[in-house]
């Protein structure tokens, strides 16, 4: 019997979503500090047979937590104890910023979705970098102690709101300079709808010099090749999706994260009352309604790029079956986030058990 849905309804459904997130994350970190997280990890951890080798990295499993949950690397170790094979930190910007005014996070409970216009609220790259370094050190020590594979830690970087588009590349380079030395991989986020003008950076004339600058800086400051990916929006036309894929291939990027949240409200099959959705205002919608388009983009990218790009699929992932569907469609890695808010702290563990059953049954 699953108790979390009833607990969510009683404890969180009446609460401001952002406050609920803060309290829930605090609970996860408390479990870690008290040693409960270590106990939980014995039942949530993926099987050793679930390991995947991607971008020169070994992931304990193909399923991880998307950017947006742990924006400042304040609970990375705690999150890995819940069973995620990787955690993507961020989005982190070159400068600290408070994000957009509240309220800025809204639930569509009937659709198991959320609308957010957070606006990259974060502490800035210079504050986050030492936390990432500390998390990696702790995870490495735990890996030695337990003999289990260390979860992978990626970092997602975005543009500071106060920085103009003409200076965007320099802002991304600033983040790269301090974060790349500690990131297992880097994701360039040019697809959030909540920073004015950001999605214009998906246009090839703007994206090419930005990615070249980030690649060069990552190589310069690390002395190693840090895997580099770009995260795209589901709202791109198909021809623009393939154009970004061609650019990624041209520049030697490692992969594409597909997709971010959508600004669409029509054509998603929403069950929430139209007026209630409209009352939420602007922002990116994530969760179950994004599943179809996210899968479409994944299949399009796989058909276009074949094995030449690593594809990380995110958007509408809730169950182990969803994860397997994305892997079968060509994803190397799969991420989730919104379902975590509805499914609770044992969500990744349930997905790992589902993947384990599927492997035993030869699926």
UniProtKB/Swiss-Prot annotation:
Main localization (coarse): membrane
Source lineage: Bacteria, Bacillati, Actinomycetota, Actinomycetes, Micrococcales
Listed NCBIfam families: PRK05286.2-1, PRK05286.2-5, pyrD_sub2
Residues given in the record as substrate binding sites: 71, 116-120, 189, 194, 260-261
Entry's EC annotation: 1.3.5.2
Topological type in the membrane: Peripheral membrane protein
GO terms of biological process kind: 'de novo' pyrimidine nucleobase biosynthetic process; 'de novo' UMP biosynthetic process
Xref: InterPro entries: Aldolase_TIM, DHO_dehydrogenase, Dihydroorotate_DH_2, Dihydroorotate_DH_cat, Dihydroorotate_DH_CS
Active site: 192 (nucleophile)
Signal peptide start and end residues: none
Keywords (A to Z) from UniProt: Cell membrane, Flavoprotein, FMN, Membrane, Oxidoreductase, Pyrimidine biosynthesis
Annotated binding of FMN, by residue: 67-71, 91, 156, 189, 231, 259, 287, 316, 337-338
Name recorded for this polypeptide: Dihydroorotate dehydrogenase (quinone)
Membership in a protein family: Belongs to the dihydroorotate dehydrogenase family. Type 2 subfamily.
Required co-factors: FMN
Recorded name of the encoding gene: pyrD
Catalyzed reactions: (S)-dihydroorotate + a quinone = orotate + a quinol
Localization (cell): Cell membrane
Subunit record text: Monomer.
Matches recorded under PROSITE patterns: DHODEHASE_1, DHODEHASE_2
Recorded metabolic or biological pathway in which this protein acts: Pyrimidine metabolism; UMP biosynthesis via de novo pathway; orotate from (S)-dihydroorotate (quinone route): step 1/1
Record's function text: Catalyzes the conversion of dihydroorotate to orotate with quinone as electron acceptor.
One matching Pfam family: DHO_dh
The UniProt record lists the keyword Transferase: no
GO molecular function: dihydroorotate dehydrogenase (quinone) activity
Cofactor binding note: Binds 1 FMN per subunit.
């Amino acid at each position: 019997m699953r108790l979390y849905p009833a607990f969510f309804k009683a404890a969180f459904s009446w609460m401001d979503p952002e406050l609920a997130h803060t309290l829930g994350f605090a609970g996860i970190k408390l479990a870690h500090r008290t040693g409960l997280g270590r106990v939980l990890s014995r039942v949530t951890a993926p099987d050793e047979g679930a390991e995947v080798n991607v971008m020169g990295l070994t992931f304990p499993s193909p399923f991880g937590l998307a950017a947006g949950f742990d924006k400042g690397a304040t609970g990375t170790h705690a999150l890995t104890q819940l069973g995620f094979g990787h955690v993507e930190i961020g989005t982190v910007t070159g400068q600290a910023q408070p994000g957009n005014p509240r309220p800025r996070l809204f639930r569509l409970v009937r659709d198991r979705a959320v609308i957010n216009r957070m606006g990259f609220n974060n502490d800035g790259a210079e504050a986050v970098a030492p936390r990432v370094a500390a998390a990696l050190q702790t995870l490495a020590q735990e890996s030695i102690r337990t003999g289990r594979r260390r979860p992978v830690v990626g970092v997602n970087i975005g543009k500071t709101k106060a920085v103009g588009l003409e200076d965007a590349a320099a802002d991304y380079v600033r983040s790269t300079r301090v974060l790349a030395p500690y990131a297992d991989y880097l994701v360039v986020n040019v697809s959030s709808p909540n920073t004015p003008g950001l999605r214009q950076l998906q246009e090839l004339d703007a994206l090419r010099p930005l990615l070249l600058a980030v690649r060069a800086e990552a190589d310069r400051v690390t002395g190693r090749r840090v895997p580099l990916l770009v995260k795209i929006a589901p709202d791109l036309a198909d021809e623009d999706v393939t154009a970004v894929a061609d650019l990624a291939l041209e520049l030697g990027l490692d992969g594409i994260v597909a997709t971010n949240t959508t600004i669409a409200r029509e054509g998603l099959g929403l069950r929430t009352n139209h007026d209630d959705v409209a009352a939420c205002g602007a922002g990116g919608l994530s969760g179950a309604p994004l599943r179809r388009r996210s899968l479409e983009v994944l299949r399009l990218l796989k058909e276009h790029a074949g094995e030449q790009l690593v594809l990380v699929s995110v958007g509408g992932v809730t169950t182990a079956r969803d994860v397997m569907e994305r892997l079968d469609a060509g994803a190397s890695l799969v991420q989730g986030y919104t379902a975590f808010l509805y499914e609770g702290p044992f969500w990744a563990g349930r997905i790992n058990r589902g993947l384990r059953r599927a492997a035993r049954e030869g699926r």
